């Protein structure tokens, strides 16, 4: 894939830090069933003021067009998750157990300390591969922090199936088995300790299984698809491997109690951030992907710019390439702008890591421009000084109420 899937809304592209993931290989656990697969309520009526991030945003001129087929498909998942959260929130307030009762339940199901160990291991993985985000999770409540770690690990393991050291051995059948494991853990039958942590998470938060299934579908695409004819096609791929993460994690991170935004609009912003981050991955890694025989750019827009696949493989920066890249970067920034509107409506303890990630990732686009659009042989990155400056600024911005 262009740069690996997102592992959490605020820690996109887990593979960028390098390293192997052998310590997350599956192993058996002895966990008893915990819950039935959640069935979301009926979809709510669409609100006139909440529309999904536009796949139809033109690269050269940001005019809004009619909603595309990919947007329609993704929007149904957004509505489904938003409905699940809205239906669960009042019930959660009424039935929430005291912490000591939750701990007794954890011990009853997994045995003394096993679930705690599972979450701790997830935290160790997050700390190793997503240091900045891990730091931000320390501001969250313990329950939310552990849940985000569990989601991160599942996403990273999923990404490693097609981007890891054993990727050449992965088949569609293997991904089918992985999806069956996902269904099992949602039904309370985890296969190993990492699955157990996620199984516990989805029993406590109104998380829908569909975004997880959609991420697996993104992995399936990477087994056979290496070209995207239109941005509509690419948008759907970006949703599968990155936009899904926002839908997974917002139910855990929570929406600010004093927010006036609709649940649906906050999920649209989460989706936009995933799309923006994956587009940034793609634009950063054009040369790397080309060396693997892959092009994650809309071929019709390349043709409109007077460029061909051979121009990508040749890797020479020209006037045509600069003009093309300016349009692609402009579109990614539009998605970042859409995402930033929603971050301020997250729960106050969750805003900082998300906002910091957004600001840092958006600066990669600046770095591509600073490299004179040479993303063939130069890798754009954000220097340590800029990172250190962005973190306190993001913290200050996150402290402002929506």
UniProtKB/Swiss-Prot annotation:
Q: Which CDD domains match?
A: Trans_IPPS_HH
Organism of this sequence: Zea mays
What's the stated role of this polypeptide? Answer: Catalyzes the conversion of geranylgeranyl diphosphate to phytoene. Mediates the first committed step in carotenoid biosynthesis.
Per its record, how is this protein called by name?
A: Phytoene synthase 2, chloroplastic
Q: Where is the composition biased (Low complexity)?
A: 44-54
Kindly name one Pfam family recorded for this protein: SQS_PSY
User: What domain of life is recorded for the organism?
Assistant: Eukaryota
Question: Which cellular compartments is it found in?
Answer: Plastid, Chloroplast, Plastoglobule
Q: What is its main location?
A: plastid
